């Protein structure tokens, strides 16, 4: 028995495609496929790996679930939240998390533009809304927009995925458009 685990951020449906390809090539093989995306931040990868705030595992069989549960047993014992779901949901969670954070950054930058035009202090606005436990203060720092190796590509990938299934994500698309507009016209 082999369990193939995808750790990378991959388009929704990749796990199923990997499984189908493997079954076609080796119909007699005993295996499962799992999606287990990493949530490592740039500059904090080692800490995030050792002390993740959550683990997301997409599986489609009890056998795969048990293997992954045993693999993550040390984190389970430390009460790290572990979310077991199907592969497509696991793949989507990774994109949704990164896109949400990118959209939050875009939001505070839009508020910064408004503050500049009406004479308000964006840092006080960010502090005031960030104290709301439902919102939180992280990613409420006005600046050049989101970047890095993940947020831009994951945002556009999620927009394209939604378009392919006729479920447009207008807020996310506008967030990406805003980022591009500010790159070319600061």
Spans of model-derived segments:
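ADP-ribose/adenylate-binding Rossmann-like module
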Residues: 1-11
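Short beta-strand to alpha-helix junction loop
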Residues: 10-15, 97
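A short glycine/serine-rich beta->alpha loop
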Residues: 141-145
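Internal alpha-helical scaffold of NAD(P)-dependent oxidoreductase catalytic cores
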Residues: 18-37, 41-137, 161-165
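Single conserved hydrophobic/aromatic residue that forms the stacking wall/gate
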Residues: 178-186
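Helix-enriched interaction subdomains in cytosolic or periplasmic regions
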Residues: 148, 152-176
């Amino acid at each position: 028995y082999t369990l193939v685990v995808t750790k990378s951020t991959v388009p929704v449906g990749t796990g199923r495609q990997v499984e189908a390809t493997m079954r076609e090539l080796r119909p007699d093989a005993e295996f499962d496929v799992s999606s287990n995306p990493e949530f490592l931040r740039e500059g904090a990868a080692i800490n995030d790996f050792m002390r993740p705030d959550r683990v997301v595992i997409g599986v489609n069989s009890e056998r795969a679930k048990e293997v992954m549960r045993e693999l993550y047993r040390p984190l389970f014992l430390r009460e790290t939240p572990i979310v077991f779901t199907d592969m497509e949901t696991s793949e989507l969670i990774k994109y949704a998390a990164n896109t949400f954070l990118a959209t939050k950054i875009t939001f505070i930058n839009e508020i910064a533009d408004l503050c500049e035009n009406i004479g308000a202090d964006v840092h006080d606005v960010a502090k005031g809304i960030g104290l709301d436990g439902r919102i939180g203060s992280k990613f409420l720092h006005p600046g050049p927009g989101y970047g890095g190796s993940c947020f831009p590509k994951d945002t556009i990938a999620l927009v394209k995925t939604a378009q392919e299934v006729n479920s447009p994500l207008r807020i996310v698309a506008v967030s990406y458009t805003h980022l591009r507009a500010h790159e070319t016209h600061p």
